[in-house]
Amino acid sequence: IRILDTLRRNALGAAGLDSHPNVELVKGDVQDRASVDAAMEGMDYVIHMASIAGVDTVLKNPVPTMEISIEGTMNALRSAREHGKIKRFIDFSTSEVFGTYAFRVREADVTSLGAVGEARWTYAVSKLATEHLAHNYYKQFGLPTCAIRPFNIYGPGQVGEGAIHAFVLRALKNEPIQIHNEGDQIRAWCYIDDIVDAIVAAMTRDEAVGETFNIGNARSSVTIYHLAKLVVQIANSKSTLEFVPWDFADVELRIPDVIKAEKLLGFRAKVDLETGIERTLA
């Protein structure tokens, strides 16, 4: 396994991968074609995840968000095509492509993006563009690609943003937990082990080629308010909940339909929300 990363966040160190004997770490930027080519050498599979993520980070960096996603994906696809031996190229997209209201959405449903000029949607727009790039590299050049749209991943070792990650950190310190507006936004949370199972299936199943898959756990749907209460309860924390105004665009409802992934990948999320939070807290 070879990982190309800028190391701007200590994601690998937090997960213990920086010293794993089966992992080779290459420091580089996906926007630098030479770095991508060096990382691609000798590889059979590509899992392309490089991007800026997290609403707060995207709001502050809308231009780099789009540049890294689009330029980075173009570099990765061109390199993979020229490499000539890639068995599967998996492009990580996002559930954000479904916009502000997404109930039981299927892969073929029309995507819905926000108004031009609203910084939040730069991430979704760029990811939708990378999906089109990946699919058309398959259609036009025969590169065996597929795309995954993950719905709210969480788990141990997570860095950066994400509600469960933020809530867990504060709950363990008995610090107040901030909730945007009334906390009535609904999300479906998918534990990291289930996401990994889906990735492995997408790598190894021929049916995945040329397809896009929603990957998530509709059974773990909950409001942000009740999620915060659940984290506090499981952590046996003394944290209080604070409601803070949020004036930016937000997603009110996001729950996936994963029937396609069940049929073609054999995917079904196994870890329920309570168990996942317990493992994340451990």
Feature names for model-found ranges:
Residues 122, 160, 192, 220, ...:
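Amphipathic alpha-helical segment in the mid-to-C-terminal domain
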Residues 192, 212, 223-226, 247-268:
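Conserved C-terminal active-site "lid" loop/helix of NAD(P)H-dependent oxidoreductases
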Residues 128, 146, 153-166, 175, ...:
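Glycine/proline-rich active-site loop of Rossmann-fold NAD(P)-dependent oxidoreductases
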Residues 19-23, 108-114, 141-142, 168-179, ...:
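A short C-terminal helix-loop "cap" of Rossmann-like NAD(P)-dependent dehydrogenase/epimerase domains
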Residues 35, 75-79, 189, 194-197, ...:
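Conserved mid-core alpha-helix of short-chain dehydrogenase/reductase
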Residues 1-150:
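N-terminal Rossmann-like NAD(P)+-binding domain of SDR-like oxidoreductases, especially those catalyzing
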Residues 273-282:
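Amphipathic terminal alpha-helices
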Residues 81, 138, 172, 203-204, ...:
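Protein kinase-like catalytic domain
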